[in-house]
């Protein structure tokens, strides 16, 4: 499912994926990607909604609002694979989705809600006999995989849309193999014949 794939391949937040529109799909220097410019958030019905004044917001449906990102860092360009790019456009053309229409909606044509995605995500996990984890863990996976690939910190924060590497590191979980590989690169082999001789001398002196 493309909605799930975007969580892993692009590290996009839930609201950013729900709000994705064709006009956000761009090619820069021949690189396909997503220019993240908006998100969907729950702020309540129009008569009850309390929205920060610095956010541009448009009511979509029920308690759902289309807003600008909460931080400058969240407004970012995230490269995606050619395969994902082509499949997104295939969906757009097949369903006749306009430039400012939502790429993902529920069966009634309304914006996707987290509860709807959570239901389908859990259903997919069960079908694949996988343990229950939240879809938000996909962002942790993206942060961890970019760290494993030794991507520079500034690039990782740019992709994740974080304001600092501290937050990105909070999402990062190093696996044992990558830690071992990094340690092997940093620390040379310290074992040689001299080490054995020195140990014997120290023992005799004592």
How should these model regions be labeled?
Residues 1-14, 18-20, 28-31, 65, ...:
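Basic, Lys/Arg- and aromatic-enriched nucleic-acid-binding interface segment
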Residues 35, 77-79:
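Generic structural detector for well-ordered beta-strands
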Residues 3, 36, 44-47, 88-89, ...:
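Extended hydrophobic-aromatic, low-complexity segments
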Residues 7-50, 154-155:
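Short, charged phosphate-coordinating catalytic segments
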Residues 1, 10, 78, 90-111, ...:
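Short, basic (Lys/Arg/His-rich) helix/loop patches that form interaction surfaces
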Residues 31-39, 134, 145, 154-175, ...:
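Short functional hotspots where side chains directly engage DNA or cofactors
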Residues 40-75, 82-84, 107-108, 166-169, ...:
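C-terminal secondary-structure termini that scaffold catalytic or DNA-interacting sites
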Residues 20-23, 141, 174:
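Structural detector for helix-capping/boundary residues
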């Amino acid at each position: 499912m493309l909605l799930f794939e975007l969580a892993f391949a692009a590290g996009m937040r839930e609201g950013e994926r729900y709000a994705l529109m064709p006009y956000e799909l761009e090619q820069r220097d021949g690189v396909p990607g997503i220019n993240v410019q908006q998100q969907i958030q729950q702020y309540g019905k129009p008569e009850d909604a309390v929205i920060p004044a610095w956010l541009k917001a448009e009511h979509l449906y029920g308690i759902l609002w289309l807003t600008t990102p909460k931080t400058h860092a969240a407004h970012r360009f995230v490269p995606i694979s050619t395969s994902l790019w082509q499949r997104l456009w295939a969906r757009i053309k097949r369903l006749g989705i306009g430039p400012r229409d939502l790429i993902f909606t529920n069966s009634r044509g309304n914006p996707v809600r987290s509860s709807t995605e959570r239901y389908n995500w859990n259903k997919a996990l069960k079908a694949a006999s996988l343990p229950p984890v939240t879809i938000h863990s996909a962002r942790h996976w993206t942060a961890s995989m970019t760290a494993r690939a030794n991507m520079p910190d500034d690039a990782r924060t740019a992709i994740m849309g974080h304001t600092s590497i501290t937050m990105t590191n909070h999402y990062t979980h190093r696996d044992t193999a990558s830690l071992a590989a990094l340690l092997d690169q940093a620390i040379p082999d310290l074992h040689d014949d001299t080490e054995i001789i020195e140990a014997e001398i120290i023992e005799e002196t004592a």
